Amino acid sequence: MAWFKKVRKPIESANKESRVPEGLWVKCPSCAQIIYNKDLAASLSVCTKCAHHFRLTAAERLRSLFDGSWTEHDTGLRSTDPLRFTDTKPYKKRLETTIASTGMLDAVVTATGQIGGRDVVVAAMEYSFIGGSMGVVVGEKITRAIEAAIEYQQPVVIVSCSGGARMMEGALSLMQMAKISAALARLDRARLPYISVLTDPTTGGVTASFAMLGDENIAEPRALIGFAGPRVIEQTIRQKLPEGFQRSEFLLEHGMLDMVVDRRELKDVITRILTFGAKPRAAGPAVVTARS
């Protein structure tokens, strides 16, 4: 029975290194579908099986909305550390680390370009920058963008994706809620449209200010929208919240939103809204000099 002792070597690959690059596939956190990266990008980071909306970066958001190229403004503004704040690490160090990892100076990008052939001012928030939190720079850039829109008679689109006011900047961050809201009031008096797009998540001081002040408040499907998070609310009231509470569909049903729109249809919806409220085009770039 010597043949029992015969051991054959396993078949070896001619190339022992894997030929499949890392990061080529993405697993959907909702349905566990494995999606090819290029297919996901082609669908604007929406799952091709269950329509789960992955988060977009600010740059990806601008690419999904503008017709082509755009001009970014106030690129040099960056946060300082006025309170010398320290939690688990100094705020100054946290800023340095985040700037290095994201390649951005703060949590919002403001730009002008065209949507559906019309000049528009767009602000897109970046969640990977300290949770998209709103500090002095975010408030200043959005306010300048709104003022530019008023000067050049252009509509405004703000895409929110934020955990709220930035606690490391204390009352200075809370002031931005009033500052942006006041700028939007001036935009309203100028009879220029403001479209607010709420994405997952939009919470805290951002929800309590400019995110809910749009002439049209549009949310992406299943986006978490609220002031305090559901876990905090449950711990405070000691009750279980209803199914889907603080999700965009729940808010639409209860009159807090105008519509819930799939990301793949968002640009067309915004284009139609802008057509209804369009004004004649004004000459000149939407650039505003720094205020003292």
Identify the residue ranges that each predicted region occupies:
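Conserved catalytic cores of soluble enzyme domains
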Residues: 160-278
